């Protein structure tokens, strides 16, 4: 039986891999081991997701603090050890965070095939760590697993073999559908004194300049039909 080693470490990517083990059990022709790199360790950024989704990491790394470069180095070393001991047929990574880059580099050094979901995206903003990660590990020699049909042509325009680009869908939506009933029954809106049609809060990534990001967020939200009455307030929109 084939084995996939799925590596995640941050809040957004926890949500994207919740169905992987269930799919493996249903198919019966491959197994999944889950690695939590510890990039996000706060209870509200990590533990709560594993508890609510019923996930149990098979490997949990403890990475020392330090500079971003030092942490990336520790991640690569720790993930190399896990890959050696697990001996998977392929390593699966998601997105463009440091855990993704570290796992990709470790897998490449060990000549283990890499499955990269949400790969091949670019936004041209080199002030973002995520964009630097995308550029650092260019995937020209491996398949790309895309989650957005409208952007599948971008890697080909940069020289990627079109036959290596595969649309696989958005695994975060798989999680949304699977937990839809629990979401509807949740009392969290009441706990936070919010209503489905009331104000919403958007938390942007801290990279880049706030002025540029605020313009982009405003343009994106205002372009939606449901946001025709969008108002911006400096009381609620501020850089952190």
Regions found by a protein language model. Name each.
Residues 1-36, 228:
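N-terminal phosphate-binding or glycine-rich loops at protein starts, especially the Walker A/P-loop
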Residues 6, 34-36, 116, 167, ...:
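Structural beta-sheet core signal
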Residues 28-71, 78:
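Conserved nucleotide-sugar phosphate-binding/catalytic loop shared by glycosyltransferases and other
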Residues 40-44, 63, 140-214:
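A nucleotide-sugar donor-handling region in carbohydrate enzymes
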Residues 215-229:
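Short hydrophobic signal-anchor/transmembrane segments that target glycosyltransferases
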């Amino acid at each position: 039986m084939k084995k996939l080693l799925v590596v995640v470490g941050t809040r957004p990517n926890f949500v994207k891999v919740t169905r992987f083990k269930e799919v493996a059990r249903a198919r019966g022709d491959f197994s999944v081991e889950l690695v939590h790199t510890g990039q996000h360790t706060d209870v509200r950024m990590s533990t709560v997701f594993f508890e609510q989704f019923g996930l149990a990491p098979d490997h949990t790394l403890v990475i020392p603090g330090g500079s971003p470069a030092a942490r990336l180095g520790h991640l690569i070393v720790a993930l190399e050890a896990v890959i050696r001991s697990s001996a998977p047929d392929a390593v699966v990574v998601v997105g463009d965070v440091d855990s993704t880059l570290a796992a990709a580099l470790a897998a490449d050094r060990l000549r283990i095939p890499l499955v990269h979901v949400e790969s091949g995206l670019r936004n041209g903003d080199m002030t973002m760590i995520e964009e630097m990660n995308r550029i650092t590990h260019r995937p020209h020699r491996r398949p790309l697993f895309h989650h957005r049909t409208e952007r599948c042509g971008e890697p080909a325009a940069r020289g990627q073999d079109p036959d290596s680009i595969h649309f696989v869908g958005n695994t975060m939506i798989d999680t949304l559908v699977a937990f839809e009933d629990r979401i509807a029954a949740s009392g969290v809106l009441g706990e936070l004194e919010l209503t489905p049609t009331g104000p919403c809060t958007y938390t942007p990534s801290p990279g880049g300049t706030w002025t540029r990001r605020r313009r982009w967020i405003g343009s994106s939200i205002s372009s939606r039909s449901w946001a025709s009455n969008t108002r911006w307030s400096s009381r609620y929109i501020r850089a952190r």
